[in-house]
Amino acid sequence: MSEEQASSPSAKMGDEEKPVGAGEEKQKEGSKKKNKEGSGDGGRAELNPWPEYINTRLEMYNKLKAEHDSILAEKAEKDSKPIKVTLPDGKQVDAESWKTTPYQIACGISQGLADNTVIAKVNKAVWDLDRPLEEDCTLELLKFEDEEAQAVYWHSSAHIMGEAMERVYGGCLCYGPPIENGFYYDMYLEEGGVSSNDFSSLETLCKKIIKEKQAFERLEVKKETLLEMFKYNKFKCRILNEKVNTPTTTVYRCGPLIDLCRGPHVRHTGKIKTLKIHKNSSTYWEGKSDMETLQRIYGISFPDPKMLKEWEKFQEEAKNRDHRKIGRDQELYFFHELSPGSCFFLPKGAYIYNTLIEFIRSEYRKRGFQEVVTPNIYNSRLWVTSGHWEHYSENMFSFEVEKELFALKPMNCPGHCLMFDHRPRSWRELPLRVADFGVLHRNELSGALTGLTRVRRFQQDDAHIFCAMEQIEDEIKGCLDFLRTVYSIFGFSFKLNLSTRPEKFLGDIEVWNQAEKQLENSLNDFGEKWELNPGDGAFYGPKIDIQIKDAIGRYHQCATIQLDFQLPIRFNLTFVSHDGDDKKKPVIIHRAILGSVERMIAILTENYGGKWPFWLSPRQVMVVPVGPTCDEYAQKVRQQFHNAKFMVDIDLDPGCTLNKKIRNAQLAQYNFILVVGEKEKTSGTVNIRTRDNKVHGERTISETIERLQQLKHSRSKQAEEEF
């Protein structure tokens, strides 16, 4: 990703940092190590004098800006003409090209609107509020609540922090994008590092920069001039040489900071009302472990201090729910440096993993999917045919076998195409629904590996539907019903987006139109709200994007419903139609509900906070004897529940009191605690209570097993209450 792309608010937020986990870190956040140049617990102070490159860069910029302003003034005088600006309600406002700005139009409506507007949107593209309009256009004025406005707000905040970092550390700034919640900036330091002790002085300097209301200025400059301007910074020069393919690109200035950036930005630094620096880590240049080590600092900002308080509360809750912490505490899974990005699932974690797969497998039988098993290793010729070798080979594990190049599969679809093609196919076989839980490997950069959310080895509930064009609508309806069934059992709400034909698409436009219409019909019949995402489909077919919402309000994308017109062409897949045409091409629907099973386990762990629903719980039953005389009976009870296929344990610790044993079981999130004493031993019963201390009383063993089996089979979300 280029500097412009990485810093652009139009770039997809969250690419650098996922909602679950931190991303690309190899040093504990907020490292306490003392810097060589540091000032003890007080951290670093602002450099005096500033690094020489700041003044040299500013002198060069000022000269270029004066020339630019002169040209712009001349253009405004010479080329300005009346234009019409159309607002969202259809009202038109008169303006002058090269003179009138979105901010002036906002002021004309109301000063309150102008003050609360973060950024403009001109002809659907984000635009600086103080940048003159150039032609007839549509205009939207976005407030902080809008996602694109948030990205701009956090992007501008990153520049404020970047200015402070230059003035405190004097290093070379690298990337500084907005992310899912906030922003970060990377910096290369010749010596020393960043300490959490520095945060206070950085924040103080950021507040000073904000108070100064430094204007954000945009300037388009020739590439060769920028190479001279940034000659002190090898990273900016790399970006210019390797990523910028145009004769000119843009820089933005606030105060003494000038940085490569596509923009846009808020009007001035004073628009950032509250800013907090909350974390640091180290990372590698572009995530590659053989490149330079960089220091990364994370921040967050808001237009209202109350929002920061809410964010801090949310962060504390998210920290307590971190799947890596819960995974360790509950002995579910772990990672090891000898196999980075490949999870070790312990017995209780494996139970969750296998239960999820069996859940999907049971739905497959109801819905006409046929499960298959396919190879893990393929000759590279397969990936050349599919097109993955050209675009994805860097992310594949490849190796030589008998002088031929092979690779571990990163996805199942090409193998399923070979399956479809291994014999002639008839229209009577369609739709053919092929499901595969095969192990996949993707060569993620080591710096990007994050818990279960970014791994190298994983499995998906992957399926491909081979169907005729006219069958798309019904198949999509089936996929949508499938995901609603699964997500309702998990307790997730979700939102849907239809992403349609992009500008650069492959195939016949009529085929696209017909397919998109069928997707629309399916979504309308589904009955849930959905939004149109025009032009955001893949080049090979339209798709439905599904985002689930977890217990603390975060959104995650797991499910996939993607049409593919190109893979059948690349593999020359055909079927004989009912009228005898043996050259008919199927459409492929790529479909997953859980997505990566590993990632879904991370999301579920955090969603439930480790408090697993009974059917999925790795700790369903704990048997607690009142005393040693009941141990033998307790063992028999445990064996009966084990034989009934429950996850059951027993606490025979003689050093613990009964109350302590019960409390330990509740804290360990055992759904049901079965207490057995002399009375229960005599009558062949158990005394039942739940992890939330709801007492259900005495029941026979057979009665208890039967009821728990019913609750398990129904996948009840509240089994403890419903018992």
Curated annotation (Swiss-Prot):
Q: Which Pfam families match?
A: HGTP_anticodon, TGS, tRNA-synt_2b, tRNA_SAD
Q: Which reactions fall under this protein's catalytic activity? A: tRNA(Thr) + L-threonine + ATP = L-threonyl-tRNA(Thr) + AMP + diphosphate + H(+)
Which SUPFAM superfamilies does the annotation name? Class II aaRS ABD-related, Class II aaRS and biotin synthetases, TGS-like, ThrRS/AlaRS common domain
Bias (Basic and acidic residues) ranges: 13-39
Top EC category = ligase
Modification Phosphothreonine occurs at: 246, 453
Sorted alphabetically, the Gene Ontology cellular component annotations on this record are: cytoplasm; mitochondrion
Residues with Phosphoserine modification = 39, 702
Region (Disordered) spans which residues?
1-49
Keywords, ordered alphabetically: Acetylation, Aminoacyl-tRNA synthetase, ATP-binding, Cytoplasm, Ligase, Nucleotide-binding, Phosphoprotein, Protein biosynthesis, Ubl conjugation
Cited Gene3D superfamilies: 3.10.20.30, Anticodon-binding domain, Bira Bifunctional Protein, Domain 2, Threonyl-trna Synthetase, Chain A, domain 2
Enzyme Commission (EC) number = 6.1.1.3
- Post-translational modification as stated in the protein's UniProt record: ISGylated.
The TGS domain sits at: 79-143
Residue ranges that the Swiss-Prot or TrEMBL entry lists as coiled coil: none
The UniProt entry's GO biological process terms, in alphabetical order, are: threonyl-tRNA aminoacylation
Q: Which family does it belong to?
A: Belongs to the class-II aminoacyl-tRNA synthetase family.
Designated name of the protein: Threonine--tRNA ligase 1, cytoplasmic
Supply the gene name.
Answer: TARS1
